[in-house]
Amino acid sequence: MAPGTLTELAGESKLNSKFVRDEDERPKVAYNVFSDEIPVISLAGIDDVDGKRGEICRQIVEACENWGIFQVVDHGVDTNLVADMTRLARDFFALPPEDKLRFDMSGGKKGGFIVSSHLQGEAVQDWREIVTYFSYPVRNRDYSRWPDKPEGWVKVTEEYSERLMSLACKLLEVLSEAMGLEKESLTNACVDMDQKIVVNYYPKCPQPDLTLGLKRHTDPGTITLLLQDQVGGLQATRDNGKTWITVQPVEGAFVVNLGDHGHFLSNGRFKNADHQAVVNSNSSRLSIATFQNPAPDATVYPLKVREGEKAILEEPITFAEMYKRKMGRDLELARLKKLAKEERDHKEVDKPVDQIFA
């Protein structure tokens, strides 16, 4: 799609064909049919070694083994900071298109604004707008790609990034200890942890049953922390897409999910959350995803293989190579789906009119 916004498309009565997904990819559960299967865990007392820490750690480990996804409350991130970050994000997407498009990141730019981030070659696009920026390592920050509107964006997002980095490392400590390792092991395996923040805006959609806000995927990195509003739309599956649940929004909570890197480091013990985002025709939705990723040259290989197990990777590889392979598989799948769609469309064109509308 050429640079632009979804604003004008959101007001149409029919969904643009660029967003219409094949039937097997369409939502099976509505955005507001919530499930309470995803654990909500209070972190109050997690620093009390002789207090509640043991029970909190047990709950986190169980959630990672069963789902790879859970929610945390009492996490220590200031509520005013969360409110400011949310307000600024909403204000950014309410800006006139020309203000957002000053930070257009199409064409390979690192950071900024884009409509429907998707793999090159994909036939179908996601129904979302995003603004993204890279906040760690600090030395690599390119403030020219960070929005300068609304006022206060940089100051608040810097503080938010710092607090989320701290929370992510604390959660990785828990998982390291559960694996029988030193508590810094998972963080150290990232070498020089990268942090990317993606603010997602999902406008109202004229035909939400035909599309997705964000297609089904697992995150490539170590761990992701998601702040979402109360609308609903985040969905997860743990049976390879046979059944989906919509995660119940919890005020002030962060949804935490493990990525592929975390999955491999645990030798498959902790699941990489399989998830997607659906949209609706009643209201827009906002979410802020903080991706904690390893450095490109970090090693991807199990940190510990338990007795009786085999390593789930044949050999160590770098995160850059792991990511390249993942994107390669996704691109090939997208190419095959695009060819299949073109073939179906071609057959429809070749049909007599009376058969097409029969």
Curated annotation (Swiss-Prot):
EC number: 1.14.11.9
One Gene Ontology term from the biological process aspect of the record: response to UV-B
Cofactor: Fe(2+); L-ascorbate
Fe2OG dioxygenase domain: residues covered: 190-294
Residues involved in 2-oxoglutarate binding: 285
Pathway: Secondary metabolite biosynthesis; flavonoid biosynthesis
Keywords: ATP-binding, Dioxygenase, Flavonoid biosynthesis, Iron, Metal-binding, Nucleotide-binding, Oxidoreductase, Vitamin C
GO MF annotations, alphabetized: ATP binding; flavanone 3-dioxygenase activity; L-ascorbic acid binding; metal ion binding
PROSITE patterns, A to Z: FE2OG_OXY
Top-level division of the source organism's lineage: Eukaryota
Keyword Iron-sulfur: no
Residues given in the record as Fe cation binding sites: 217, 219, 275
Assembly description: Interacts with Dihydroflavonol-4-reductase (TT3), chalcone synthase (TT4) and chalcone isomerase (TT5) to form a flavonoid enzyme complex.
Entry function: Catalyzes the 3-beta-hydroxylation of 2S-flavanones to 2R,3R-dihydroflavonols which are intermediates in the biosynthesis of flavonols, anthocyanidins, catechins and proanthocyanidins in plants.
Protein name (Swiss-Prot/TrEMBL): Naringenin,2-oxoglutarate 3-dioxygenase
Organism per entry: Arabidopsis thaliana
